[in-house]
Amino acid sequence: AAGAVAAGAGAVVAAERIAIGRTQMLRRTAAPENLGQLRGQPLTVITDDGVPLHVEIDEPPAAETPASRAVPPQPLTIIFCHGYTLNQDCWHFQRAALGEHRLVFWDQRDHGRSGRSAAGAASIDRLGADLDLIIKAVAPGDMPVVLAGHSMGGMTIMALARQHPGLFGTKVTGVALMSTAASGLSAGSPWMPGPIRPVLTRALPVVLRGAASGYRAMLVEGSRRMAGDLSFLSTRFIGFGDPQVHPAVVDFLEQMIRSTPIEVISAFGEALYAVDMRDTLEVLGRVPVVTMTGDKDRLVSPSLGLELAEAIPSAEMVWVPGAGHALILEAPEVVNEAITGLIARVDAGAAARECSA
């Protein structure tokens, strides 16, 4: 009992220190503006199983060719696929910086403003099928697309490659993959203590399934809402590599995670645990690819990011020292530069094909 009391007191002290530290950080740096408030032209895409997917399109300024595109043979559309427990707002910094291009953002099923799917429909393969419908809806005809995926969003792109390999090298002209892997998540996350990592990893799907069932789901949701500063600390630790990341950015990530129901976290957690997309990497290699990995990623082991880049013949890898899993929020300048570089490679390939035609 004394140990429990001491542990509780320690948690309170830790929470107070976090709150004080957060206040000091706010005083030192200016908060990013309008986090999650950028909006585009809304569109609803209905999946084959009846789930409404919320899509937003940002058109570039009228009659303006992006200065960074030397050869724009066709209007290029970049489609962004967000990660597990997040929504399209996580691309805030990319949306703000890449507006000279035609940008498409969507909430994956069961996330953000998209609808809930039936029990058993939470699978990575289903997300790949959804992405195919998004492409058809927002980039009809021969309009080329570049796909960008963070974490689970990268696996969504891999699932599309498995289902529709013919799109890559024709419709899909480039791919950007951030903080993701093709397999190996069942080996556990880097933050888990090494000796007990296999045990924790095997137990995780069972724990999530139990937490999402019946009255337990209500208890878990209540606990999540009351977590306060301790939730802030865990989000900062798991999501970011730099402990000095602005607290407004940590809060932004935390709010997205909190808005995801525990049932969705459970269902897609199991799907991610079992994912193996290694057979799709040859297909991705048909187009220019850039992969990005933070060396402080505590959710997807950086070694898996290295393996991914090595397995894709056309991949260029961007290694980001000090960055964690939420790379798109923590190192947006690096991510934006990598995407811009990918577009330049796509354009160079298109120009070369035109010259040889």
Can you name each region flagged by the protein language model?
Residues 284-285, 291-293, 297:
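Short beta-strand/loop motif that positions the catalytic acidic residue
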Residues 143-191:
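Conserved hydrolase catalytic core segment
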Residues 2-44:
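An N-terminal hydrophobic leader/cap segment in hydrolases
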Residues 51, 56-116, 150, 155:
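Conserved HGGG/HGGXW glycine-rich cap/lid loop of the alpha/beta-hydrolase fold
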Residues 212-283:
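Conserved alpha/beta-hydrolase catalytic His-Asp/Glu region
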Residues 170-219:
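Flexible "cap/lid" loop of the alpha/beta hydrolase fold
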Residues 128-144:
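Conserved acidic catalytic loop of the alpha/beta-hydrolase fold
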Residues 306, 310-357:
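Catalytic active-site module of serine/aspartate enzymes centered on a nucleophile-bearing elbow/loop
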